[in-house]
Amino acid sequence: MKRNKLLRGIVVVGIAALVGCVAQVQAQERDAELALLRGAAEDGDSAAQFTLANHYYRGLGVQQDYDKALALYGKAADQGLAAAENRLGMIYERGLGMPQSYGRAMTFYRKAAVQGNALAQYNLGMLYETGKGGRLDYSQALDWFRKAAEQDEPDAEEEVGYFFQRGFLGARDYEKAREWYKRAAEHGCSNAQNQLGYMAQLGLGVEQDYVQALDWYYKAAAQGNPNAQENIGYLYQHGMGVEADYIQAETWYYKAAGQGNSNAENQLGYMNQYGLGIPPDLAQALAWYRMAADQGNKTAIENLKALSERLQGVDAEMWQAASVDAKQAVEAQAARRVRIANLQRQIVDLEMDARLEESLAESGTAAAAPVMGALKLRKEADNYRAEAARLRAELAGLDVLAASSAPAQ
């Protein structure tokens, strides 16, 4: 028995030592790769400057440092690297490490877009569509979206479909909208998948089909799309295409509300107020209505006003207690929402960076930058996707934690 224990102890120690050695080797490899990147960047290699900037921008293997990232992106952009120009546009649009400037964002997006960078073309189109660049121009927006869509940029394909669905530049054309949505959906765009579900649910250009709608919503929800999650909740709440199930409805609403979907927040308020599938909880109802109302949801504003007046008129003490509980619930949900939003943005950006590195590998940039080379650029892309996968696991953990702390069914 003692001998077996001794052997087990030796095995455990051996495994621990092996794991430690592997980690040490991996750390040494990362340090060597970073040293190589720094050297190449100092020698003026634009691909290396861009890649090293990504490390500082994300804090991957180095201390996060926006100033160093911006300086390196700037050097790469000065050499005409479209990927760096697009990234500078994003940084100015978001105001990361510097004052927000839509004008400068548009300038950098345009520089990259005229070089054929699909992401920049899409981003430039969004500034025209929203008017954030100083001028609302649907014609310019659609023109840039089409250019990006011709390069199979999924979000741009979805936007082209949206223009046809809404009729921004003429009559609505549901058939063309569906064509573009399907193309984007096949490329993994969750917004397009959700829109296809919406069109099937309402029968826009197709025969109304709740089952097909639910199928598309599930595809989009699997990617974390909050609008699709809210739509699934609605179908379960009202028994459309499925048997009515309040517990399923609340589960999906809760997922969507965690990402700030105001319709889902309002629906959770309604379900808590009237005890649909759960015990009535007026404090929770107030909290959810308030969160949705703070985002300008008109139905929630009306519901919040009506419930507040009812409680104040019936029992002032109950109203006070419910208000305190609601305030605490709002604060907790707001903190969770910020964390979720940050994780999702990082995941999207990492996936985008992976595509940019692959694009550099496939272009002439890799041939002109022998220190980086196509293989190293593709390895960087793999590293970004691995980090995105880690963040997805963390995001999934937040869902599990939220489910365990949600009100009892």
Where are these regions (language model features)?
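Bacterial N-terminal signal peptides that target proteins for export
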Residues: 2-11
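Bacterial N-terminal signal peptides
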Residues: 10-20
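Structural signature of tandem alpha-helical TPR/SEL1-like repeats
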Residues: 28-35, 63-72, 99-111, 135-147, ...
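Short helix-capping/linker turns of helical repeat alpha-solenoids
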Residues: 42-45, 58-60, 65, 78-81, ...
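Hydrophobic face of amphipathic alpha-helices that form TPR/SEL1-like repeat modules
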Residues: 51-58, 72, 87-94, 123-130, ...
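TPR/TPR-like alpha-solenoid repeats
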Residues: 55, 76, 91, 112, ...
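Pro/Ala/Gly-rich low-complexity, hydrophilic intrinsically disordered segments
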Residues: 295-353, 360, 372, 406-409
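Amphipathic alpha-helical coiled-coil segments
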Residues: 377-406
